[in-house]
C-alpha cells in the first residue's frame, strides 16, 4: 500500500481523489494512509471481510469524480500513469478501459518469472493486454477504469468470489458500452511470492472461467480451453514417457521456449529457469480448476463454487 500511494503522490496530474477500502485485513493499512493525508485527497474506509467486490463497490459509492479507477493494493503506479489515461480519453473517449501490467526491476526473480508467465503470449494467448492476442481485451481489476455513472448503472461488481472483474467487463460490452485497452496506462504488478499461493490463484481462475461461461453463454473461447488441453496433454505425455522416453520431447521444447522467452525479456538466466515451473503451475493449475468446474457445473449441474476460500483473501 505504501508503494501504491507513493506512486500516486508522484503523478504529474494532481486533480484526483483516492479512496482506500480496508476489507477486514489482518494487516491494516490505516497508519500508512494517515502518512499521506497531507499529500493526497484521500479517504480511508473499513469494512468486515467480504471479498473484493463488496469493497470496491463501497469505494465507488464514496467517489465523486466522473471516472473511477480500480487498482489493486499490490500495484505500483509509474509517474506517467494518469497522464497516459487522460491522453487516451482525450484522443478517443470511451465508457470503460484497462491497462496492462509489468514487472518492476526491483521485483524478486520469482515475481518476475510469474509476471512473464502471466503476460506472455505463449501462456495466456495475449488476452491480458498483450499486442498479440487470441481474444478481445477485457479490463481486469488490478488496472481498470470506468465512467462512474456506467459503473453504477451496471450495479458494480457482482457477488462472484473469483472472476468478478471479467464478469463486469462482459456486462460492459453486453450493454453496448465502449471499452478498450490503454496500452500506455500500465502498472507494475507484484505477483505471488511462492508457487503454492500462485497455484491457488490460478486454480480459482480456471474455476471462474466455467462460472463466467454459465453467467455469460457464448463467451467461452478456444484460448480459455487451451490450459485444460495442455494439462491433459502433459498427463498423457508423462504416462507415455514411462514406455517411450521420446514422449517428453514436446514438454522439453515448450520448457525451452519459456526459458528463452523469459531470459531474453528479463535479461536473467535465473528468471528464465524459474519461469519454467511458473508456466507449468499456471497452466496446470488453471487447467485443473477448469476441468474440475466443468465436471461439477456442466456435468453434475452444481452451483457456483470456489477453492481455498478460507485463505485467499488473507
Model-derived features: where do they sit?
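Membrane-embedded multi-pass helical conduit in multi-pass membrane proteins
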Residues: 230-300
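Short, flexible, basic/aromatic active-site loop/helix in glycosyltransferases
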Residues: 99-105, 114-137, 152, 215
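Acidic donor-binding/catalytic loop of UDP-sugar-dependent glycosyltransferases
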Residues: 27-28, 75-88, 170
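Conserved donor NDP-sugar-binding/catalytic core segment of glycosyltransferases
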Residues: 79-112, 116, 185-186, 190
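Acidic donor-binding segment of Leloir-type glycosyltransferases
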Residues: 5-46
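Catalytic donor/gating beta->alpha subdomain of glycosyltransferases that bind UDP-sugars
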Residues: 158-220
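Short aromatic/hydrophobic "clamp" motif used to bind/position activated sugar donors
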Residues: 68
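Glycine-rich, basic loop-to-helix element that forms the pyrophosphate-binding segment
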Residues: 47-63, 84, 134, 138-142
